[in-house]
Amino acid sequence: MDASILLFYVMIFTGIANLILLILEKDGHAGKWFGKVNILFKNKILGLRFFEKIVYDMASDLIPKYKSISVEKGSEGLLEYIGEIVYKSTLFSMFSLAASLILAYAFSNLIIVFFGILSFTSILYPYIDYLLLKGEKDRGIYNELVFFAFTEYICQESGRNIDYALNHVINGRLFKWIRTEAKIILTDLLIHSKNLYNSLRERASNTKATVYRRFLDGYAGIYATGGNLLTYMSHQIEVLKNDLKFRIEQFLEKAQMISEINIILTVIMPIVVIVSSNSRSAGIMQALAFSSLIIYTVAMAFFIEDSRPKTGLGNVKVKPKISEIILTIMVFTVAFIILKNLWLPITIALITFSTIYGYRGKSKLKEARELEEPLPVFVRDIADYRATGKSIYQAIVLSLKEKEYNERFKKEVMVVVNKLSLNSTDLRTDTGIWLFDYVFDCLDLIQKSGGGSTGILIELANMIEDIILEKEKVRRETALASYLTYIAPVLFTLVSASMLALLETIALGTSSGISIFPVNTFQVERDWLYLMIVANTFSNTYITGLLKEGSYENMYLTSITLAIALACILQMDNMVHILKTTVFGAR
């Protein structure tokens, strides 16, 4: 069976599967029925002695590991979690094995069955999850600590110690890893009856995050000696802001390195593609080249996620809708039936998805900027009203009434004002824009703790402004990578056209008079070359989006770069002809 036909069937199957998922999501009765069947089937599988033993053995091994990184997975929760993983991995492995058997039959190659059997290793995912969480925890604490420090600064200004700030964090939704740490410290205080000094020192001795350990040790020492904790917190905020700036500088250096690697790959990849297309094991070489590009893209995505500092937990991402995925698959299917090749339907489908999903993602990123940019001015306006004796509630209402902000910002603040008009005492918001929600969480804490001097509000405004400026600096410094992304498909096409022109000139014998290659050798592999141009363009744009925004949401750029790639591909023959006649002297 031809690989293109097989991929076509795979896409059709995926489309039907997504359609079923959409029906289950929209139809309540169908969803409930499927849920009951799923639970019954799950209980039946996990009730088997073999799977039950796997779950308990893995849980007994992983509980100490999770406790060592202070992750909240108790024995019962961990059993349920591992049971779910074992169940899903079993289903996944069964389907993978069935698919590998079909592929082995279609291609008459039993080696494919081996890959289906390997899919059963997905049952070990809880161990991978532990390793991922272990790295995520340290990064998360670094990202959250400067904001928690200011939360504690607000509490300290009103005469309350760190335990009050920890309680506030637990009752909120803004922090993840600091929230976990807060639960551990408060458990020592309230259940194990330890004093604050011993609780903080013990927690500091059990953490590997250097900045966090120093933060706790310093606070505990000054608390025990009766020093000025407000001054200490002010100093720590400056230290943590400088640490954030340092990590951003490191990230920008890595971003420049990644951009250079992308350009190098763009130049090398056409050579690899054309050489692999004419080797004895062309199919295997092509598969390796394509797989290497996928692995590189995924590896870069993880590397960027690991290196790029976040604002707290980061903003809530816009997820693709099932309808968008189904539409993309339908576009691919229709284009494949009409055009009878693979690269062009994939290009059209990717442009379709990048446009419809990218538009929503672009709108979300624009909304984030519209909510973040007025925050420093807004907080300073509140500080001005506080200086005249107004409460936080009154200052928010007056700022919205008398000051000028953009419409999106005013709309979200109006939600808070409406709550206040109904005698609500909760100022917190849930927009999904982390920095905006954090500012209102601080205002809520100021109101409830009885603090909120003009000075502390000005310091909050300055800190938020510094954070926004650093985020803008990242976007500005990575702008070059965006410009190079537009050039990448042109560069890929130019290198490819140059090689094709040279090889076809040699094939025609114009250089030496000897026919070394058949004339049609390169024409047959054009579809593969075009597919790699599209894949390389998509990879470059995806990586650039992660570098600039820290998010895959800005896929609108992908539709533009893919359109450039498509235009370059359509002009490939003309470019080859021009190079043959002008550079290599062919007639």
Predicted regions and their residues:
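Transmembrane helix interruption/hinge and helix-loop junction motifs
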Residues: 2, 105-112, 279-285, 335-346, ...
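Short, non-transmembrane cytosolic segments of multipass membrane proteins
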Residues: 27-62, 202-228, 425-453
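Loop-to-transmembrane boundary segments
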Residues: 70-94, 255, 259, 325-336, ...
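Juxtamembrane/interface alpha-helical elements of multi-pass membrane proteins
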Residues: 111-204, 327-430, 438-445, 452-474, ...
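Helix-boundary and N-terminal cytosolic regulatory elements
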Residues: 44-106, 551
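Bilayer-spanning, highly hydrophobic alpha-helical transmembrane segments
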Residues: 9, 14-16, 88-103, 111-125, ...
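Membrane-cytosol interface segments
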Residues: 1-71, 239, 359, 366, ...
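Membrane-anchoring hydrophobic segments
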Residues: 5-9, 154-261
